[in-house]
């Protein structure tokens, strides 16, 4: 929501994708329209390959040509090496890797010769500071980071592909607000990322026409502090 509103404030018309949160998506659309920009909400199950492949065409049919895709949707379920299953990995890979690749492919196909579009993939600071928690999620995001580089190579010059890697930003799982606040401060800067920080970074990489195939860390330096567990488990 924060990213969508920030882009609207910067003059973008916005397609708000949702899987199940229709009311929240429509509320975001209403707020964007109130800012004077065009907006629609489109439902799509990111595990449905056929639906993902048509999502950009559906968006363009209602709002006009698409020149930017922000892959922010993410599956974030807990597992570890001791309870790993192929079903859990497959679910994470479909949402966190396959869907972003298909959307980048569709954007490249829709971008005319001589024009340039951009894909922004939301990653995670833990790729630069590994721990054993959230195994399937981490593997899927690590694959997306590699895909960010490979897509940037393959889809240039029509499409730039850039990663943004935030730190802990919102309450995760069964964290209490107090636990989140403690975890949020475990950085060299004394704070991790906020939704506004991430939105600002996304706006920056969209406008930075010389950036592609790289990842911008926006985490207050969280990746510089090694932890044995995921930062969401920090309680003291």
Give, region by region, the residue ranges found by the protein language model.
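A conserved structural motif in NAD(P)-dependent oxidoreductases
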Residues: 187-198
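Substrate-binding pocket helix/loop in short-chain dehydrogenase/reductase
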Residues: 80-81, 85-93, 183
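Conserved Rossmann-fold SDR core element
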Residues: 7, 145, 155-169, 211-218
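C-terminal substrate-recognition "lid" of short-chain dehydrogenase/reductases
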Residues: 196-218, 223-224
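Canonical Rossmann dinucleotide-binding motif of NAD(H)/NADP(H)-dependent dehydrogenases/reductases
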Residues: 1-15
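The beta1-alpha1 cofactor-binding region of Rossmann-like NAD(H)/NADP(H)-dependent oxidoreductases
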Residues: 22, 43-55, 86, 196-197
